[in-house]
Amino acid sequence: MVGEQPFLLGVNYWPRNKAMGWWSDFDAAEVRDEFTLIRSLGMSLVRIFLLWDDWQTSPDSVNRAALDNLGTVLDTSAELGLTLDVTFFTGHMSGPNWAPGWMLLPDEPLPPRVNQLVSGGEVVDCGYRNPYVDPVVLAASELLLKTVVAQYREHPAVGFWNLGNEPDLFAWPPAPAAGRAWVRRMTQVIRELDPIHQVTCGLHVDSLVHDNRLRVSDVFAETDFAAMHGYPMYVPWARDPLDVDFVP
């Protein structure tokens, strides 16, 4: 504890044997085994990701099986003394972007800066709706938040809610004001249901050195605390790919 701020040691989690196939091939025993290992290593926080493609196969519904499986993950975490960072809108993860089929725009090209797009388990080559301003995506996003937060806001394993994993890598807002408005809107939806747990949004170094219209100052003016992902292997000015001084 430094002052009033705890130092938490945690880990991003995907199952070792299936990675982003977790929610579509959920195994409660696997979660228990791996969370037991995480706890044995002295970690207390686990960040999990609600892969959008699995959680919302249509814009007007939330995958009930995934919702129930999240309850299993939370129960297991509580039993083991782990706290969860629950990350919504996981459209970007480990290279590819992952978009539900209803979000695709088949006649549009793949957006700039997107290396690969996966939907329904297949690599696709097309554009998709902008999550910051598209009314269909905004309504679906609010539905996902309301469903998950209402169901689990009182669960003891919930640590905080997270609006995304480096969301600028999935899409840029059309303007900085649109990016801030999106963060404000999503945060308000959560706070109306759950005034207790804090809200953050996982950004990365590119947000510090480039204007991707999802500005750090705007994001953290609307959320409760800053979350920054530092990867020295992605910047030319780090001393080496594992530069220990890159993130103090």
Where are these predicted regions, by residue range?
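Short, intrinsically disordered, charge-balanced linker/junction segments flanking boundaries
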Residues: 242-248
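Active-site mouth of glycoside hydrolases
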Residues: 1-225, 230, 235-237, 244
